[in-house]
Amino acid sequence: MRRTLKAAILGATGLVGIEYVRMLADHPYIKPTYLAGKGSVGKPYGEIVRWQTVGNVPKEVANQEVKPTDPKLMDDVDIIFSPLPQGAAGPVEEQFAKLGFNVISNSPDHRFDMDVPMIIPEVNPHTVTLIDEQRKRRDWKGFIVTTPLCTAQGAAIPLTPIYQNFKMSGVMITTMQSLSGAGYPGIASLDIVDNALPLGDGYDAKTVKEITRILSEVKRNVQEPGVNEITLDATTHRIATIHGHYEVAYVTFKEDTDVRKVMESMESFKGEPQDLKLPTAPEKPIIVTTQDARPQVFFDRWAGNPPGMSVVVGRLKQVNPRTIRFVSLIHNTVRGAAGGGVLTAELLVEKGYIDKR
């Protein structure tokens, strides 16, 4: 039986933080023992958190005292999960890594550091070896590993089996992203009610950059950010759903490609987490539906087992002999954030990168 690992969750009262708490409360060997928060230090977690997810605050953590983000108080912590906001996260994560802590970050601050892995466990698990380079280059015993933008994961996971099996030449993506992607309290109601809000060229470019990096690592053993064989573009929007990012992708190929073969490649797709039977790995990373009006955010965002860990793909269509269309749905705060972070931690444990400090 695997020994228990102690986890700290930074920003434990935020929208992603509460998903970490929920998913780790009954995890077989990673336990949330240190809940860090700003403005609520010293108070019981269950009393101060706005529990904006399924179920109730787990009894295992309800009476835990919220603590400051102070490495001196975390001596016995094995893993740090960091869903801190952009800008604030980077210096804090570096401080912890320098002190020997193992940091899994959902923040963008280190996603494009050349020695920092940006991991989707089913897609590019081999990039964990960058940790060795990171430790050597930065002369620290800890590490920082990042998870990609939730939107990038919603596209990259279904694109991976296509990229592995067919000669892609281009992808055009349009997204409709839920409110929780903007954090709490989020967007002003008068900006989003009765509206679809374009996220702008900066967010579009960030999405493309991350998908490009992820796919560039599918076929290569060395990380080459920005290098790929396909042309990518994304147009991103915020809509008034709470959880779940909806994405429409048009994929073009260098030769005639049958949509039925593409569907089969998605249905059969599995990765290392499934082979290793990691606790948070869904049996199917991609669930393909042939129902005409699916996926739908309301019905499908919690797909998979554990719930919310599968990407649902539907509405596959042969547009012309060299173009197919599909729609994907990802639970942005589960698979796209906390669940992806927990699965990454499990992979790192299995690979020997996380053990007693």
Curated annotation (Swiss-Prot):
Question: What does the record give as the active site?
Answer: C150 (acyl-thioester intermediate), H245 (proton acceptor)
The UniProt pH dependence field says: Optimum pH is 7.8, with half-maximal activities at pH 6.5 and 8.5.
Q: Which positions are annotated as binding NADP(+)?
A: T13, G14, L15, V16, S180, G181, N332, T333
Q: Which transformation does this protein catalyse, written as a reaction?
A: 3-oxopropanoate + NADP(+) + CoA = malonyl-CoA + NADPH + H(+)
- State which Enzyme Commission number(s) the record gives: 1.2.1.75
Question: Annotated Gene Ontology MF terms?
Answer: aspartate-semialdehyde dehydrogenase activity; NAD binding; NADP binding; protein dimerization activity
Q: Which GO terms describe its biological process?
A: methionine biosynthetic process; threonine biosynthetic process
Show the CDD domains listed in the entry. ASADH_C_MCR (cd23940), ASADH_MCR_N (cd24150)
The annotated thermal profile of this protein reads: Optimum temperature is 85 degrees Celsius.
Q: Give the InterPro entries listed for this entry.
A: ASADH-related, Asp_semi-ald_DH_pep-lack, NAD(P)-bd_dom_sf, Semialdehyde_DH_NAD-bd, Semialdhyde_DH_dimer_dom
What the entry lists under Gene3D superfamilies is as follows: Dihydrodipicolinate Reductase, domain 2, NAD(P)-binding Rossmann-like Domain
Q: Which UniProt keywords apply?
A: NADP, Oxidoreductase
The family this protein is said to belong to: Belongs to the aspartate-semialdehyde dehydrogenase family.
Q: What does this protein do?
A: Catalyzes the reduction of malonyl-CoA to malonate semialdehyde, a key step in the 3-hydroxypropanoate and the 3-hydroxypropanoate/4-hydroxybutyrate cycles.
Subunit structure of this entry?
Answer: Homotetramer.
Identification of the protein by name: Malonyl CoA reductase (NADP)
Q: Which organism is it from?
A: Metallosphaera sedula (strain ATCC 51363 / DSM 5348 / JCM 9185 / NBRC 15509 / TH2)
